[in-house]
Design a protein with these regions (language model features):
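An anion-engaging/catalytic patch
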Residues: 1-134
Length: 134
């Protein structure tokens, strides 16, 4: 998996591209932080997860995975992550005025990767820009 940092309104969202499944996975805690503005997004996610399991009878294992993503301290740590479908389910459980702009941002992230699959030259350009620090 290729780990990347994506930016939504200046906030970092840790992500990973699974080339076998050809889909993005995003750190759920990062998304919760962006949507809620919570000082403790890990605890907020714990409560949402508990509510989803109890009230909605959701099997989180069907759309949540533990992935090693780079933590703020620079170390690779396991964190809950979900693909786009899972993220949309989670967004529905979090009341936030940022939900709609975030959904549009997710769609753009997905479109960028599809464009790169269709035109591999875009991947090379993106890697060049990234290595040049632009």
């Amino acid at each position: 998996m290729d780990n990347e940092i994506k930016l939504f309104e200046g906030n970092q969202i840790r992500s990973a591209w699974d080339s076998e499944r050809e889909e993005w996975y995003f750190s759920i805690v990062d998304i919760v932080a962006v949507l809620t503005g919570s000082n403790n997004p890990r605890d907020y996610w714990y409560r949402v997860k508990k509510r989803m399991t109890e009230e909605e009878k959701s099997e989180l294992s069907t759309f949540c995975r533990q992935l090693k993503l780079k933590a703020p301290d620079g170390k690779m740590r396991e964190t809950d992550a979900a693909d786009m479908q899972g993220i949309f389910r989670i967004i529905q459980s979090i009341p936030s005025p940022k939900a709609e702009p975030f959904k549009m941002w997710l769609a753009e992230v997905g479109k960028e990767r599809l464009d790169e699959i269709i035109d591999p030259e875009l991947t090379i350009d993106r890697a060049f820009i990234k290595s040049a620090g632009v």
